[in-house]
């Protein structure tokens, strides 16, 4: 394989909802380019993409697959991304290292929630988009309705390059209004026959051609002037206008294929090779210092590793994009993130499960290598005198969590090691050892995401594991003022222990003025503040600690011990053992002994006084509330609304968008526990959602009592 230069390379992400046919399209592209001699199928589990055992087990893409095709002296690096929203991280990774996206649309359903999710990410990253309508041979395909829905969502920027003469099982012809030709196929697909557009299709073709010419002309003043003068553009001028429209996202070309029968795939690759922008024509990336980085093969050597993982029969494979300069086998590079040195082994052009050894890859190209000693996903490796770092991939918050444990506790360490390594392969799921909840928690994008994780642990790592519900991080607070005092006294020969603390607790809200007096037992006491600490608690909220002891009742040297005792009880609220927050404590009196008083005595006295006062101050449990956005087909809106109301959700607003609804709500975290499973069941997997922490709010009284009883039962069981 020859070395391709930067101006001969195009990087493309293949996106689409689950079932839209991306892996089948990828197989046809690889077959059409001659890399493989026979097309595999998803059903036969022998495709170049989707080659991991877990993907064979479930019949869905789990990881993004990198491959390339050589077409008309161009190199197209293509990343086939998982379609399930549970694996959205693959699409996000791919979009950040490619320059444009082909978004497949299932001709049976039109734009789905997954389509719109993918499109939003292309919008955020300002990537060109080509829409590809697939499954045109399905008897459920309604092409005109699909186009109408696309126009309703994406507007006039959707410009048809092609349309099918008919759809359904007899599909065998596409009219191309850029070339003004018709492509036809025999029943087995493959190489097309290119013919003139028949008379009965000419009016429609001319109308769409005129729309295409107008859209292309709008992207270039010279083309616009020619269009006004002649009302026509040459084929090359059309390509130039479309290319500029792709870069500015003013045109979203629409193509047609039947990937399963290899119809229309070669024409798509021709367009990708001839029209879509090169790496060198796209906006420049920036390093972590904000410096603009040009994809220049003569620039400093810098390589970004966007994906690492263990692959069958090979070991660790690391995928990279050359950001600048050239990379060759044997290069000595420095890891800018870890400070370690790396010698690059054999480098490869990617072809899914296959790899093709190459001598060199230049700026803008994508490749892989194996068995690096200290490279993780997201690391940057540089040559001499280069200190760049890249950190541009941002992943969404997890939406589904479970506690995880090894069935055999002796394998706990092995489990943690495997989890941390697998997080490097897929950064969209997180592992946390929660001191607060006393659980090891894995958080992912959905139930299917974690189910595939479990399968890999059991089958690849030979670990027996089990999932349990994740505990909820409740908080405790108070609703009224209360006072208490406690004397700690212990005498056992020699120096004893003595400390007495009198204190007041009350709810604290941001901006509250400091107290000047309090009524205690009907008598008003003035507060003389000797010291004040405002502590931002690491679990959220505040503790305000005021020392107003006068007359030397307690030495100032014991105040840190008193605060420590209070903080100890703040970490273990009396209702459920949860963290306490938003409390003001005023220590106003106490007693000490000239010999027996010490820090331990006052810490214990303060802890018990605070606990007693807290219980009398109208203690309440707070629960985490999340902002929820649900994207759902309009047909399912009633069921989704009803389900949310049963989950104590507060509906905040709704928007409609071409057959879909975007619903905003606030919902307790407890009610989100199995929401991804329920939503998928209600909508046949055609809805998606995002969440974000919003606030802590009081739980209803009936739930509070239930939580207190559950905590008491757990505490008794542990004893």
Feature locations, PLM:
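Structural and coupling elements of P-loop NTPases
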Residues: 1-719
């Amino acid at each position: 394989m020859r070395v391709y230069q930067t101006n001969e390379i195009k990087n493309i992400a293949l996106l689409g909802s689950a079932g839209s046919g991306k892996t089948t399209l990828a197989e046809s592209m690889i077959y059409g380019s001659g890399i493989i001699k026979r097309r595999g199928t998803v059903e036969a589990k022998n495709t170049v993409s989707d080659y991991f055992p877990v993907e064979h087990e479930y019949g869905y893409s789990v990881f993004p697959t990198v491959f390339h095709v050589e077409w008309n002296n161009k190199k197209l690096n293509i990343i086939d991304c998982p379609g399930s929203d549970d694996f959205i991280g693959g699409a996000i990774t791919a979009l950040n290292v490619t320059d444009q996206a082909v978004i497949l649309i299932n001709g049976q359903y039109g734009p789905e929630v997954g389509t719109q999710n993918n499109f939003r990410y292309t919008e955020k990253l300002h990537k060109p988009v080509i829409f590809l309508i697939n499954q045109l041979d399905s008897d459920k395909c309604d092409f005109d309705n699909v186009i109408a829905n696309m126009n309703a969502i994406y507007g006039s920027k959707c410009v048809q390059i092609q349309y099918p003469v008919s759809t359904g099982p007899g599909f065998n012809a596409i009219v191309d209004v850029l070339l003004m030709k018709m492509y036809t196929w025999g029943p087995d697909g493959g190489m097309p026959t290119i013919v003139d557009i028949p008379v009965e299709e000419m009016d429609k073709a001319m109308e769409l051609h005129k729309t295409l010419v107008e859209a292309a002309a709008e992207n270039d003043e010279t083309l616009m002037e020619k269009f006004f003068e002649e009302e026509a553009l040459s084929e090359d001028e059309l390509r130039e206008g479309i290319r500029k429209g792709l870069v500015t996202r003013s045109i979203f070309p629409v193509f047609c294929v039947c990937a399963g029968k290899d119809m229309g795939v070669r024409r798509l690759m021709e367009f990708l090779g001839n029209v879509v922008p090169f790496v060198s024509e796209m906006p420049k990336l920036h390093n972590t210092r904000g410096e603009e980085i040009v994809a220049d093969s003569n620039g400093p050597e810098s390589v970004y590793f966007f994906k690492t993982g263990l692959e069958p029969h090979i070991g660790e494979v690391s995928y990279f994009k050359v950001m600048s300069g050239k990379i060759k086998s044997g290069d000595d590079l420095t890891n800018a993130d870890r400070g370690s040195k790396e010698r690059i082994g054999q480098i490869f052009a990617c072809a899914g499960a296959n790899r093709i050894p190459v001598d060199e890859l230049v700026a803008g190209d994508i490749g892989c290598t194996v068995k690096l000693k200290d490279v993780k996903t997201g690391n940057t490796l540089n040559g001499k005198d280069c200190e760049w770092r890249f950190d541009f991939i941002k992943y969404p918050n997890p939406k589904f969590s479970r506690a995880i444990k090894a069935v055999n506790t002796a394998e706990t360490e092995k489990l943690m090691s495997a989890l941390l390594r697998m997080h490097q392969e897929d950064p969209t799921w997180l592992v946390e050892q929660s001191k607060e909840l006393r659980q090891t928690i894995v958080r992912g994008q959905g139930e299917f995401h974690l189910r595939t994780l479990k399968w890999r642990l059991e089958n690849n790592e030979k670990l027996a594991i089990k999932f349990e519900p994740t505990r909820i991080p409740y908080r405790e607070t108070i609703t009224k003022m209360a006072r208490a005092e406690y004397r700690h006294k212990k005498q056992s020969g020699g120096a004893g222990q003595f400390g007495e603390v009198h204190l007041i607790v009350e709810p604290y809200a941001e901006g509250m003025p400091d107290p000047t007096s309090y009524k205690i037992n009907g008598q008003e006491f003035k507060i003389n503040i000797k010291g004040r600490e405002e502590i931002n608690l690491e679990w959220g909220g505040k503790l305000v600690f005021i020392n107003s002891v006068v007359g030397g009742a307690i030495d100032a040297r014991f105040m840190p011990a008193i605060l420590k005792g209070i903080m100890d009880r703040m970490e273990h609220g009396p209702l459920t053992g949860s963290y306490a927050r938003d409390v003001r404590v005023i220590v106003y009196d106490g007693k000490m002994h000239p010999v027996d008083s010490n820090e331990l005595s006052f810490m214990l006295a303060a802890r018990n006084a605070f606990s007693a006062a807290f219980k009398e101050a109208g203690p309440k449990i707070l629960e985490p509330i999340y902002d929820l956005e649900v994207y759902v087909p309009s047909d399912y809106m009633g069921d989704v609304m009803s389900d949310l109301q049963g989950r104590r959700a507060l509906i905040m607003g709704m928007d409609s968008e071409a057959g879909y609804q975007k619903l905003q709500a606030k919902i307790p975290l407890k009610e989100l526990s199995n929401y991804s499973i329920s939503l998928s069941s209600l909508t046949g997997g055609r809805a998606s959602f995002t969440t974000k922490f919003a606030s802590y709010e009081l739980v209803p009284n009936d739930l509070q009592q239930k939580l207190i009883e559950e905590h008491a039962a757990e505490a008794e069981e542990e004893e």
